[in-house]
Amino acid sequence: MVKLDYRALGLKVGLEIHIQLDTGRKLFCHCKPELKNTEPDFRIIRRLRPAMSELSSIDPAALWEFRKMKTMMYEGFNDVTCLVELDEEPPHEPDEESLLLALAVSKVFNAKVFDEVYVMRKVVIDGSNVSGFQRTMVIAHDGLAEFLNYKVPIWTISLEEDAARRIEDKGDVTVYRLDRLGIPLIEVSTGPMEYPPNSIMEVAWLIGRTIMNTRRTKRGLGAIRQDLNISIAKGAKTEVKGVPELSLIPKVIEYEALRQVNLLKIKDELNNRGLSRESYTPDLIDVTSVFSSTKSSIVKRTINEGGIVAALKAPGLRGILGFELQPGRRFGSELADRVRAWTRLGGLMHSDELPGYGISKEEVAAVASRLGVDSFILLMGPQGVELQEAAKVIVDRIKEAFDGVPEETRAAKEDGTTYFMRPRPGAARMYPETDLRPIRITFELLAKADKYVPEPIDKQIERYTSMGMSRELARQLASSEYSIEAEELIKKYEDKVNPTLVASIFVNMIGGMGKNIEQLNIIQVVDKLLELYVNGRVTREAIQDTIQKYVEEGGRRGVEDIINEGGLWRMQYSEVASIVKSLINNGVKDKGKLMSIIMRDYRGRVDSRDVEKAINEFLSSEQKS
């Protein structure tokens, strides 16, 4: 792959970091903010339709969702769902603790808090909000986050309700679960930054960790989500939704920049070929007869089910339809994305990838001859509106290619590539909530928020290094989801246990195990092991072995049972001295070799300090004699 010069390209990236808050209630009702994995207590069916805003306009993203003609099924629970989520009751006053947390985050990022905060309705009719809109409040603006070597412009800090969980798609029905709907979220939106992709990832981490230092954020899958706004100098702003992991951010940025570079190359090539957007029309030609004896299972199945094969002329696009934009994704993939997004069809085939899919060279030549063009697109499905709609969106996307990069919202895949989700939302998407009064931000509220103001992440790292941790370990602990628990245990065993040991337990021993610490009570396990360590009953190595066994067993047995079975109780000094004496008497007199043998044969049961002390004593006495 070509290495991109991001500075020369004029790469700019903005971040939107969303973090769920761990408060006592949902944002606009008094239901518990908990996710459920049991059978729902009830289900309801809804259809959402767009309506004109107060400015007499319809948001294009909302219209796009409506045209998919989806039905929504909502699963609810009596203890975490009420009439507010069902849009059968007005919202309650916003949760004060959530508001205080948003104010605290605004303070740490030096943002200007608005004197008065308005609850707004953001149009969302993908079904994730029963009402058809998400309630959101812009709390502060125009901030500046300074940490490590970065200066990050903070555009807005918002407090909003999370959406319902998408569970599955059943044909034309999408199933959502209402337990997550209404859980408070803080959204931090940055201005465009010109840092390279790896630095953008670090900035996202710094923002997220700083918010988590309020100690009022949720954990687990989906608790933190990142969106990216990416553009290059001659391209367009593209919003990439739902980057699942921080580590994927650099790859998503790289691939989106590459995609925009290649779309600009296509624009230039279209002009060089003297092509005109007027040459492309959504007129379909039925070419089913060409495939009467086809060996393609895809085509054969369509015809057997009563469908047709329709061809769309794409004059002059030979080599362009198959032009790679991102690894494994071509311009034809962009067209297929639009078809899948706007219709129920599964995609398309184009002449640059044929012969293929079981379609023969002769069939390709026959279609080209019938159409009288060098390149074409094939669509398959029931004859009617779906095929016509697919042809229209394909032609629209081809015409957009003459302008270069279209503004759109895309979704991130696990390999870092992206696909089309929907058009970029317009200004009509947001309008005031009519059921709630504005919130006056008083000095009293600002003072109450002070207790939630989080410690900046760079200050946290400095504090850890002052405890004797290496900078790398301090950084790892600061980025660990267990940093709060580690600090509590460091404080509990102050002057008795080296903070570096506590940090390494959480970073190196637990950090990579991928288990839910709440379910396994792992904090209590570490606490018990540190207590035994302080009392001289277990070694550092035994702590690691016991934790590993405990996690492997899913917490089935207690700490002392595991230690008993593994014979991991720490040997008394007299036992260690006896082992050392025996080895020396048998001719092993090299200090390094003695240490190696004993630590290998009695791993987890002997403390290295006891071994070293005994070796020094016996070797010293032997030299004197």
From Swiss-Prot:
PROSITE patterns, per database record: GATB
Alphabetically ordered keywords of this record: ATP-binding, Ligase, Nucleotide-binding, Protein biosynthesis
EC identifiers of the protein: 6.3.5.-
GO cellular component: cytoplasm
GO BP terms, alphabetized: glutaminyl-tRNAGln biosynthesis via transamidation; translation
Family annotation (Pfam families): GAD, GatB_N
Disulfide bonds: none
Oxidoreductase in keyword set: no
Catalytic EC class: ligase
Keyword Oxidoreductase tagged: no
InterPro entries named in the record: Asn/Gln-tRNA_amidoTrfase_suB/E, Asn/Gln-tRNA_Trfase_suB/E_cat, Asn/Gln_tRNA_amidoTrase-B-like, GAD-like_sf, GAD_dom, GatB_C_1, GatB_Yqey_C_2, GatE
Catalytic activity: L-glutamyl-tRNA(Gln) + L-glutamine + ATP + H2O = L-glutaminyl-tRNA(Gln) + L-glutamate + ADP + phosphate + H(+)
GO molecular function (one): aminoacyl-tRNA ligase activity
Family label: Belongs to the GatB/GatE family. GatE subfamily.
Subunit composition and interactions: Heterodimer of GatD and GatE.
Function per UniProt: Allows the formation of correctly charged Gln-tRNA(Gln) through the transamidation of misacylated Glu-tRNA(Gln) in organisms which lack glutaminyl-tRNA synthetase. The reaction takes place in the presence of glutamine and ATP through an activated gamma-phospho-Glu-tRNA(Gln). The GatDE system is specific for glutamate and does not act on aspartate.
Protein name as catalogued: Glutamyl-tRNA(Gln) amidotransferase subunit E
Taxonomy of the source species: Archaea, Thermoproteota, Thermoprotei, Thermoproteales, Thermoproteaceae
